[in-house]
């Protein structure tokens, strides 16, 4: 996308954090968050909330934004789409000029719809379904994340091209748009590059019973080279445990929902092996030279190390907003959206460019691969598929 964009200078992390302080001002730039701190969405949104808080403090310590203090107000969306929409309305009524939406289309879409109705830019910390687009939500709405087209293709490329796994068994949780489209794009790309899907099955989040699916798999009389499970929360561990207990020891692949320490703990040292997932970044210097600076700031605020890349998505969302506001010289929704469309952004979660509104605000972004062994994650590196499915 670079050849269709004007090359705009990006000040970068160091400029945001270490530039001289701006002139003091009595007014504020208010960022409103509808991130869910309770419920099923909390393992993704709470880390983002923490990362956003670190970013706001860093901005204010460096003098603020446009000479103004940055204030971040988050109201718990409670993992309920209706509540998320109502929270967004409340935040806008209280003066929010930018909206941070939850990390999912089903849970975050209502916040971005309200932002759009108010003429404000909204950015989801990590929604990856292509429904999180200007096509569905409006010309001022964006997601920080790669789309599932990239996430699914990255997983398929790793399986077939890098590891030589030719056959796959796919389980799709019917929970939300994210889980369904991630499997869709994995399957499409895996077949395109020569892989064979021996069986596709479904699961309903919260069932905690995988026996019917196991019966159908066992009836095939053959074992797959790789197992792709698109699910959410600790149900992922339920399915992996069930498969391992009856002798299916093939490697397991998944998406960014696996980037959850609770899942790693549930699997433990015995079951948390030969598992691979695609996510947003890695919380170490291997992923980005500025990551140690962020980790130090995070530890100073929370007295603990960040343990998931969703922390970095919160930081990056605020810093992305800040850079776009600086470029626009205003928080006006149309101007900030234009800056986001025209900019090239270097983030902890990877370099990012957006297509214009007609192109859905599709994000051009790489992905990170992580391996889980003995219940502990390790960094495999950045990946960018040579081709991806159409959304």
Regions found by a protein language model. Give the residues of each.
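Extracellular/periplasmic periplasmic-binding protein-like sensory domains
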Residues: 240-315, 377-390
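Periplasmic-binding protein-like
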Residues: 91-103, 123-125, 169-172, 222-233, ...
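Hydrophobic alpha-helical segments within soluble ligand-binding/sensing domains
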Residues: 84, 144-167, 180, 209-212, ...
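Extracytoplasmic "Venus flytrap"
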Residues: 29-53, 75-82, 104-106, 171-180, ...
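An alpha-beta-alpha
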Residues: 37, 140-205, 321
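Beta-alpha junction/loop-to-helix N-cap segments that form part of ligand/metal-binding clefts
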Residues: 30, 43-50, 62-134, 203-208, ...
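Extracellular/periplasmic bilobed ligand-binding domains
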Residues: 115-118, 183-280
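Segments of small-molecule ligand-sensing domains
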Residues: 300-308, 312, 322-379, 391
